[in-house]
Amino acid sequence: MKRRGLKFLALGISAALLVGTLAACGSKKDSASKSSGDNSFVITLYPDVAPITCENFEKLVKDGFYDGLKFHRVVEDFMAQGGDPKGDGTGGSTDTIKGEFSQNGVENTLSHTRGVVSMARSNDPDSASSQFFICYGDESFLDGQYAAFGKVTEGMDVVDSFVKVERSMGSDGAVSSPNTDIIMENVKMIDDDSDGNPRVEITMHDFLK
């Protein structure tokens, strides 16, 4: 699908990023393209941009909440979404948090570009809990509507490989539902980056076997 058509589709399936209402790469590679290890990738959190969101995400990671959960929705050239204990886009963690984005009265300067991680939510701007999505390209039309809080800084090739899994038509009207579970086997905090930003390493189950 051409990019223009994709944008139209993305707008039409914004529900893919909504929880409970059922949720361009250049030729030059950056460091995010390099895998941090076998089937793992690293997300750097930016608490200066979204402190409430980062605190919530870090707590869930430390509690082991994400271990064994899957990416239940993968839309090529758009995003990959996971973090739902129900595995179908309708669940979340116990607590919801304030949506840190401009339409909810909070300044957020992190744009939804390739590798950026943001929170999924329902129509209620303060309904985000555990579900998150990773952008495959420039999805800046989502800016101001969702709380971007981190970025894949190592191993984006692993996230890219999600689209290699055969998918069926999802409830969002797109070919987005993986026929093979894409499972987060282990999610843990690792050393902060050189600027003191927290980092999370996600090791995936070998879903391409």
List the predicted regions and their residue ranges.
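Cyclophilin-like peptidyl-prolyl cis-trans isomerases
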Residues: 2-14, 18-209
